[in-house]
């Protein structure tokens, strides 16, 4: 198996409903997302996937939905709507708390399978860095 990884950076805010410490408050991170795609063999050009294709598909989705936006739990809709009305900022709602674990799982299981439709390669893992020192891998 051959693997290729592409890194994408984005900035987003979130909060964790029910957290007992400072993560219960709105705050932001400079996220780094590493997308690893694998194939059993390369294509006729000798590639698993063109790195530009990963960038075009994944970064386009990230920029449209996460970058410089708020990622909130759907139970935070009332607050999100007030923020959106005041700032015109886009809010991305998730079915669960927007922890690094849940964001990475959401991307890997729900978003990227729709973006990377191919029988020749597949997303094997995602690493999502919330800080330089803290990341999750799914």
UniProtKB/Swiss-Prot annotation:
This is 6-carboxy-5,6,7,8-tetrahydropterin synthase. SUPFAM superfamilies: Tetrahydrobiopterin biosynthesis enzymes-like. The active site is at residues 23, 68, 130. One of its GO terms (biological process) is queuosine biosynthetic process. The gene is queD. The active site is at the interface between 2 subunits. The proton acceptor Cys is on one subunit, and the charge relay system is on the other subunit. Catalyzes the conversion of 7,8-dihydroneopterin triphosphate (H2NTP) to 6-carboxy-5,6,7,8-tetrahydropterin (CPH4) and acetaldehyde. Binds 1 zinc ion per subunit. The keyword Endoplasmic reticulum does not apply. Belongs to the PTPS family. QueD subfamily. It catalyses: 7,8-dihydroneopterin 3'-triphosphate + H2O = 6-carboxy-5,6,7,8-tetrahydropterin + triphosphate + acetaldehyde + 2 H(+). Its cofactor is Zn(2+). The keyword Amino-acid biosynthesis does not apply. It holds the Pfam family PTPS. It comes from Rickettsia prowazekii (strain Madrid E).
């Amino acid at each position: 198996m051959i693997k290729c990884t592409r890194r994408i950076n984005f900035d987003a805010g979130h909060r964790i409903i029910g957290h007992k410490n400072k993560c219960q408050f709105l705050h932001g991170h400079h996220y780094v997302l590493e997308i690893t795609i694998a194939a059993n063999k390369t294509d006729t050009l000798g590639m698993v996937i063109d790195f530009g294709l990963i960038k075009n598909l994944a970064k386009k989705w990230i920029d449209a939905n996460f970058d410089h936006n708020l990622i909130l739990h759907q139970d935070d809709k009332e607050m999100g709507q007030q923020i959106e009305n005041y700032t015109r900022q886009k809010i991305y709602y998730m079915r669960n708390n927007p922890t690094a674990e849940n964001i990475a799982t959401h991307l890997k299981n729900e978003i990227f399978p729709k973006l990377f439709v191919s029988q020749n390669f597949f997303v094997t893992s995602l690493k999502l860095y919330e800080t330089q020192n803290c990341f999750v891998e799914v």
